[in-house]
Design a protein with these regions (language model features):
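Hydrophobic transmembrane alpha-helices of multi-pass small-molecule transporters
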Residues: 55-56, 75, 79-82, 104, ...
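Hydrophobic alpha-helical transmembrane segments
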Residues: 23-27, 68-72, 93-98, 125-133, ...
Length: 214
């Protein structure tokens, strides 16, 4: 245990009732998810979303229910932004909430074994890779199916252009639309899940270090 030598925001969080601390951490995570997506995708034009880094951190630090709240909240707010700001009235946008829920569930199932995570750095890495593999598989399948219906009933939003380009390439090579939508998700979704999982775990360890002083 590291002694507390000064009083700062982390000390305030530490001394709060657990429920209130969890709510504040979830709100901060929600804001940071939007900032990460805005910086990496919209500003730097990196074809990855990084909008679940802090959701993963919340799952590790606070548990399943707070993680689900952050995930569902992000997709709900994002859907409202598309409707109010961009005039996109597309019900399928909110269906990506399913992907977020699956990411939270797959992360939580493995992250419950927190004691085993710290056996050694190698074990930690293996567990994180396992989470990335499971969550990316869930994301690839669920996002691919949602994209499939997007293509049938709506024009896929511009923010999906990297994946849209891959999908059209597979279609041009005579794959079915459903298979093309799923295959197009593989490279981007796996890279996104791998980076977001490791980054989220890193944020969780920082929370332990600075809030719990462990």
């Amino acid at each position: 245990m590291i002694p507390r030598t000064n009083f700062n925001f982390c000390d305030i969080l530490y001394n709060m009732p657990k429920a209130l601390r969890t709510v504040i951490i979830c709100i901060i995570a929600e804001i940071l998810n939007f900032l990460a997506a805005d910086v990496f995708y919209h500003t730097l034009k990196i074809p990855l979303f990084f909008d679940t880094i802090f959701t993963v951190a919340v799952v590790f630090y606070c548990g399943l229910v707070p993680g689900l709240c952050v995930s569902v909240g992000y997709n709900l707010i994002n859907s409202l932004i598309w409707v109010l700001q961009k005039g996109v009235a597309d019900p399928f946008i909110f269906f990506y909430t399913i992907c977020g829920i699956l990411i939270v569930l797959s992360t939580w199932v493995v992250s419950r074994r927190k004691a085993e995570f710290k056996i050694s750095p190698v074990v930690t890495i293996l567990y994180l890779v396992l989470i990335a593999l499971i969550s990316s598989f869930c994301t690839i399948i669920s996002s691919g199916i949602i994209d499939y219906f997007h293509y049938i009933y709506y024009d896929v939003p511009d923010m999906m252009n990297p994946i849209k380009s891959f999908t059209e390439s597979f279609v041009n090579h005579h794959f079915s639309l459903l298979v093309s939508c799923i295959l197009a998700q593989i490279s981007i979704s796996f890279a996104d899940r791998l980076i977001a999982t490791f980054a989220g775990y890193g944020v969780y360890r920082l929370c332990e270090r600075f809030i719990e002083r462990r």
